[in-house]
């Protein structure tokens, strides 16, 4: 649902989608990739979709892989966004370190009042709010 919200509310259309998943949660990753592909096509573009499977709770490897990917993409002048909504804590934590250190463009999170197993547009907008923590971080007083 976060991806749909980002596409529709932010008009953010990535060239590359990189999915990170832990081994225990990787069984449906092909379905996730297919869903992202279908949504992207509905919005008129076709990003490359790749994924990386990591060991469960392997924070160090996750952080290293994410930092390596982000540095490589920044060298190629990509704008970089991450979605932390569905992530498990070790992966989210590993993603937030480079987000701040390497100054990512967006850290998206879909805040929902109640988890509902429904598509984004079927859930009342009052029940969900797309947040961009990088935008919000700029408002933090130092």
Locate each region found by the language model.
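Conserved TIR/SEFIR loop-to-helix hotspot centered on a Trp-containing motif
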Residues: 87
